[in-house]
Amino acid sequence: MFSSILTKVFGSRNDRTLKKLNKITEQVNQLEAQYEALSDEQLKAKTGEFQKRLQDGEDTDNLLPEAFAVVREASKRVFSMRHFDVQMLGGQVLHTGQIAEMRTGEGKTLTSTLPAYLNALSGKGVHVITVNDYLASRDAEGSRPLFEFLGLSVGCNIPGMNHAQKKEAYAADITYGTNNEFGFDYLRDNMAFSPGDRVQRELHYAIIDEVDSILIDEARTPLIISGQAEDSSELYRKINAIIPQLEQQEKEDEEGKNGDGDYTIDEKGKQVHLTEKGQIHVEEILKTSGILGEDESLFAAANISLLHHVNAALRAHKLFSRDVDYIVKGDDVVIVDEHTGRTMEGRRWSEGLHQAVEAKEGVNIQNENQTLASITFQNYFRLYDKLAGMTGTADTEAFEFQSIYGLDTVVIPTNKPMVRKDKADLIYLTAQEKYEAIVEDIKDCVKRGQPTLVGTVSIENSELISNILKKAKIPHKVLNAKFHEQEADIVAQAGKPGAVTIATNMAGRGTDIVLGGNWQVAVDGINDPKPGTVEKIKEQWQKDHDAVIEAGGLHIIGTERHESRRIDNQLRGRSGRQGDAGSSRFYLSLDDALMRIFASEKMGNMMKRLGMERGEAIEHPWVTRAIENAQRKVEGRNFDMRKQLLEFDDVANDQRKVIYEQRNELLDEGDIYSTIEAIRIDVVDSIISQYIPPQSLSEMWNVSGLEEHFKSEFLLDIPLQKWIDEDDKLYEEKIRERILEEVNNAYKAKEDIVGPDVLRQFEKAVMLQNLDSHWKEHLAAMDHLRQGIHLRGYAQKNPKQEYKRESFELFTEMLEALKVEVVTVLSKVQVKAESDVEAVEEQRRQADEQPKQYEHETASATQAPEQAPEAAPAARPGNALRDGPKVGRNDPCPCGSGLKYKQCHGKLS
C-alpha cells in the first residue's frame, strides 16, 4: 500500500525514465526546422562533421539530439516517413543499452535507425539482429537507402554467403543478420587458421529485434558446430525396434520407479525414465536380440553407450512428436523451433536424439557428431560492449533481462491509444467442444466480413483446425513451418475482409497485418503497373479497409494458452496496431497441455460438479486466475532452468575465453618461437621430474626409464647413465640443464635444415591443430561431466561447486596434455623442406573442409539424464615412474642398507 502511494506521488520508475527522455526529445524537435532548411548535401555533410567531433573526443551522448534530428530529416526525404516522438523515446532507450517495449505496429524497424546511425559514427560497427533471414534481408534493404543517403554502408549477414561476402558484410558500418549466423560466425572465427580467415570485428554494439525471442526463448539452446563421429546407424535401428515392446507405467508409486510399467514420462520436465522392471526387461530384450552378451550387464562401464541409445530412443518415441517438434522433409528430419514455429534447416539435436528420431521415422540415419565449438546466446551477447533490444512483449520478463543481462526494460507509450478489446477466456471440458466453439466464432466473423487470425501452438494443431474448416467449407490460409515460403504473401492479405488465417507461433512476427490487406504487395505482383491500375488498387484497398474497421478490425482467436503469458500477448499484439480496432479471445479445454500438466485436478472436478452441459463454456475469474498461476509456474520453472544453464555454462565460458584469447594471440603473432621455447622447457622439466624426483637421492632415479622416454617421444639418444658414470658429482640440477641443452640443440639442427621462417610457420600450424583437437576432446569431457554431476548431490555435495572444481581440473589437465603433445610432435617430426610444412597445412585444410553441422542442442538435453557416462580415469602428472618391480613397504630396501624399505628410502617417497 505504501509503495502504491509513493508511485502515485512520484510516478513509477518507468514514468520517471520517460520524463527524462522527453526532455531530450524536445531538443530533437527544436532542431527540426533548422535541419529542414538544409540542402541534401548539407544534411549529408553532417555525418562527416559528427565523425570528426567523435574523433576529437566528444561523447556520443552529446551528439544524440543532433544525430537523431539528422536521421529524422533524412527519413522524411528518403522514405517520406517522419519518426514519431515515441520512436525518438525508443531510440534513446536503445542507445543507452536498455530494452524498449514497443507495441506491434509502432515502427520498431524505423526506431532502430536512430541509435544504429549514432553508434555507427564511431566506425566500430553496429549489428542489428533479427530472428530470421527474411527479416534480416528485408530490414537491410529497407534501411539501406536511408543510411547510404547519410554516407554509411549497410551489410547483410545471412547463411550461405561465401567468405568474401561475409567479410564485406561485417566491414559495413551497420550489419543486419540473424542471431544464429552472428553466433556461428563467432565460433567459426575462433576455429580459423589465419588472421585473414576471420570475418567479425570486435563486438561493439548490438540492437536485437524481438529480444525476448532471442535472449529468453532461445537461451537454453546452445549453438554448436560439430564434426562427424563414428557411424552407429545400425545400432540405432536395432534399439528403435525395442521401444514398441515396452509399456508405460501410468502412475509412479511413492518409491518413484517401482511398478508394472517399463518407463515413466515426466511431461513437466520433458524426461522419460526406465523403471526397475524396465531396466531388467530392456536387458532381457538386448540379450535375446544378440546386442548384449548373455553374461553382460547393461550397466557395465563398457555398455554405458547402449543405455544412452535406449534413453535416446525412448525420448524420440515418447517425448518428440512429428508435426509438433519436427517435420519429415524428404529423407530428412527437420526441427521445428518450439518458440517461433519455424523450421531450422541444417540444425540437429545433440546426444544421439536426432539419430533416434531418424530411426523412428525410418529415414536415412546420419552419423553422430562431435562438438568442435559451442556457445549459448546468453554468453555470446554478453560479449558486446553495449547491448540493446526491442520487442512488443518484454515487461513480463523484465526481472530476467535485468538479472541475467543487466538490461533494464522501458515501456514506450503507443503513438495512438490502444482500442483492442481483449475478451475473457472461454473454458470447455473437452477439446472437441472447444473446436466446435472456435468454428462458430470464425463463421460469425466471416459472415460479418471481419478478418480472423487463429493462433495454434503446433503444426499438428494448425492442420487439425484446417481440416475442421475444410469440412465446414470455410476458405482459409495456413501459415506454418511447412508453408513458410508463402509467409509474406499470407500475412500481407490476412487483413482482408472475411479472411481466415491459421498460424503457428511464427505468425509473421516482424510483418504487420494491415487492415484491408496490403495494397503495396498487390502492386508489386503486377509487371510494369500503370498509374491508373495503382489508383484502382488503392481505391479498392480503402473500401476494404473501411469495411474491416466497421466489422471490428482483426479478430484474434487463441486455440490454447501458451506456456508463457508473453507468447499469448504476442499473439494478441497482432491486432490493434497503431490505434486500429481489433479484438481477441482464447478458447481453452481441460485437454490442453498447459491445463493437463500444470492446472490442478480440482479445476476439472469443480467444472464437472457444476453439471456443465455439452458445449457449455465457463467464464469465471477463479478459473482465469488458476490459468495465470499455471503460466507463472511454467515461467518460473523455465527461468530457473535458464539461470541454472547459465551458471553451468559460465564455467565453460571462462575456459572458452581463455582458449579463444590464446588462439587469437597465436594467429596474430608472426613468430611464436618464445611461446614454443617456454612450453618446451616446462615439458622437459616435468618429464625429468617423473623419473628423477626433485631433491631425491640418486638411488631413487629411474635413469634407464628417462633415457627410453626421450628416445621414444623425442627420437633423442641421451646418454644419461654415461654422464653419471663419468661424473659422480652430476647432481639433479646439472642433469636438467644438460638434457635441456641436448633437446634445444636437436631442435636447432632442424631449424638449420629448413630455416627459421619455415619452422615458425610449422610451429604455428602444429600449435593451432593441437589446440583445436584438445579443446574438442575437452568439450566432450565437459559434456559427460555435466550429465552426471547431479549425482554428487547424493553424496551431500553441491553439484555446482563440484562441477566448477572438476571442470577446472579437467581444464588444467587438458592444457598440460596440450603442451606435451605440441613438444612431442615438434621433436619427433623430421622436417626436410618447406613441402613438409605445406603437407601439414594441407592436412589441416582437409580436416577443416570436412562437413560440419550447425546445431541447436535440444533444451531437454541440457537437463542431466539419470545415467551419466563414466569418465575414464585420468593419469595424474607428476608421479615418479618406477624402473623395475614394485618394492613393498616391508621388503628389504634395494639400496643394500639391510633396513626395511619403509624405514629407509621409503620414507623419502
UniProtKB/Swiss-Prot annotation:
Localization in the cell: Cell inner membrane; Cytoplasm
Assigned EC number: 7.4.2.8
Gene Ontology MF term list: ATP binding; metal ion binding; protein-exporting ATPase activity
InterPro entries assigned to the protein according to its UniProt record, in alphabetical order: Helicase_ATP-bd, P-loop_NTPase, SEC_C_motif, SecA, SecA_CS, SecA_DEAD, SecA_motor_DEAD, SecA_preprotein_X-link_dom
Keyword Repeat among record annotations: no
Main location: membrane
Catalyses which reaction(s): ATP + H2O + cellular proteinSide 1 = ADP + phosphate + cellular proteinSide 2
Binding, Zn(2+): C893, C895, C904, H905
Cofactor entry: Zn(2+)
Region Disordered, annotated ranges: 246-265, 834-899
Key word Protein transport present: yes
Keywords on record: ATP-binding, Cell inner membrane, Cell membrane, Cytoplasm, Membrane, Metal-binding, Nucleotide-binding, Protein transport, Translocase, Translocation, Transport, Zinc
Basic and acidic residues compositional bias, start-end: 254-265, 834-858
GO biological process: intracellular protein transmembrane transport; protein import; protein targeting; protein transport by the Sec complex
Cofactor note: May bind 1 zinc ion per subunit.
GO CC term, one of those recorded: cytosol
Membrane topology: Peripheral membrane protein
Listed Low complexity bias regions: 859-875
PROSITE patterns per UniProt: SECA, SECA_MOTOR_DEAD
Binding site for ATP: Q87, G105, E106, G107, K108, T109, D512
Subunit structure: Monomer and homodimer. Part of the essential Sec protein translocation apparatus which comprises SecA, SecYEG and auxiliary proteins SecDF-YajC and YidC.
Similarity section: Belongs to the SecA family.
Name of the protein: Protein translocase subunit SecA
